């Protein structure tokens, strides 16, 4: 049965029905989230509204089959004039391309050229590092907001791994139950993106935070289990740590930029500020390319001036 959205969009009956079928397939076959489905419905509706004005009449499957890349560029330019940013434009184009590919697979149109158009580049937004003092306050066990002592210790241990070892949150939450069980270990092997392994040094503060958590955790932390657990013993999810970080921001008066990932960024930035070289930091972060590390660390002006004063022949 057709939904109301079919009658609200400016399109001929054949295109409206095909679009409705596409939306249903996204929900049943691809199992996209409700938010993504809502965004795709809205973005394609805006696209069809644009085409109605662009062509002078509501489009049908025939007009969709005659689309050119220039038409999509005009749509993006129109959205940009309305104030849409690069991220919104990219998402909107993704929805339109998904619809076009669906119509092609169904043999309804041939829009290979238009569906191959690339999304506009999105500017990279980097997390802002915390100051060293703020980072220490965030990872302090005494400063955690959780009422349960073992959960407070758990949160402190996770955050300490992000700041003290530069781990991604997924890497910290994926540690096995026997990780860091040897207090004399000076390093551990981490498997990161692309199944690449790297060696990460272990500071005494990291050992201490994990040991305090182990002593209080009521669940089995043997080798076959995960190290970090949720309140009922299941896997600890990143959203929980992000929520705890939100509480810490409010309690400590930190800006919204103080996120779990910002702790990893702070790890790199503070190492660089104390004289660490980019190649070593690249290895510690697990970046495949040095250029990623150069962008990620965001060398501050003071550090650049110090290097300039020490190394430039005319300084």
Curated annotation (Swiss-Prot):
The active site is at residues 168, 193, 261, 264, 287, 296. Residues 125-309 form the Tyr recombinase domain. GO terms for cellular component: cytoplasm. Keywords: Cell cycle, Cell division, Chromosome partition, Cytoplasm, DNA integration, DNA recombination, DNA-binding. It is found in: Cytoplasm. Residues 13-104 form the Core-binding (CB) domain. InterPro entries: CB, DNA_brk_join_enz, Integrase-like_cat_sf, Integrase_catalytic, Integrase_recombinase_N, Integrase_SAM-like_N, Tyrosine_recombinase_XerC/XerD, Tyrosine_recombinase_XerCD. One of its GO terms (biological process) is DNA transposition. SUPFAM superfamilies: DNA breaking-rejoining enzymes. One of its GO terms (molecular function) is DNA binding. It holds the Pfam family Phage_int_SAM_1. Forms a cyclic heterotetrameric complex composed of two molecules of XerC and two molecules of XerD. Belongs to the 'phage' integrase family. XerC subfamily. HAMAP family: Recomb_XerC_XerD. Site-specific tyrosine recombinase, which acts by catalyzing the cutting and rejoining of the recombining DNA molecules. The XerC-XerD complex is essential to convert dimers of the bacterial chromosome into monomers to permit their segregation at cell division. It also contributes to the segregational stability of plasmids. This is Tyrosine recombinase XerC. The lineage of its organism: Bacteria, Pseudomonadati, Pseudomonadota, Alphaproteobacteria, Hyphomicrobiales.
């Amino acid at each position: 049965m057709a939904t109301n959205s079919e009658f609200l969009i400016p399109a001929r009956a054949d295109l409206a029905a095909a679009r409705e079928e596409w939306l249903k397939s996204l929900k049943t076959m691809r199992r996209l989230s409700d938010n993504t489905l809502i965004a795709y419905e809205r973005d394609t509706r805006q696209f069809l509204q644009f085409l109605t004005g662009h062509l002078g009449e509501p489009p049908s499957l025939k007009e969709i089959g005659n689309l050119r890349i220039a038409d999509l560029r005009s749509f993006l330019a129109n959205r940009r004039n309305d104030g849409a940013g690069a991220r919104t434009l990219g998402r909107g184009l993704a929805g339109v391309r998904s619809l076009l590919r669906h119509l092609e697979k169904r043999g309804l149109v041939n829009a290979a050229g238009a569906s191959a158009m690339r999304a506009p580049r999105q500017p990279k937004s980097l997390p802002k590092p915390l100051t060293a003092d703020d980072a220490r306050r965030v990872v302090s066990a005494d400063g955690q907001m959780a009422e349960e002592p073992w959960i407070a210790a758990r949160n402190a241990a996770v955050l300490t791994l992000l700041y003290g070892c530069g781990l991604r949150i997924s890497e910290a939450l994926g540690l096995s139950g026997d990780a860091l069980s040897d207090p004399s270990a000076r390093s551990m092997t981490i498997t990161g993106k692309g199944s690449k392994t790297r060696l990460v040094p272990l500071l005494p503060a990291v050992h201490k935070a994990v040991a305090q958590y182990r002593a209080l955790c009521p669940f089995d932390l043997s080798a076959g289990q995960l190290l970090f657990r949720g309140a009922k013993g299941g896997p600890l999810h990143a959203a929980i740590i992000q929520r705890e970080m939100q509480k810490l921001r409010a309690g400590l008066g930190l800006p919204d930029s103080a996120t779990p990932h910002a702790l990893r960024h702070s790890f790199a930035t503070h190492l660089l500020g104390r004289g660490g070289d980019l190649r070593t930091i690249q290895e510690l972060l697990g970046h495949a390319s040095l250029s990623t590390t150069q962008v990620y660390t965001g060398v501050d002006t003071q550090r650049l001036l110090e290097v300039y004063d020490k190394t430039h022949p005319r300084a």
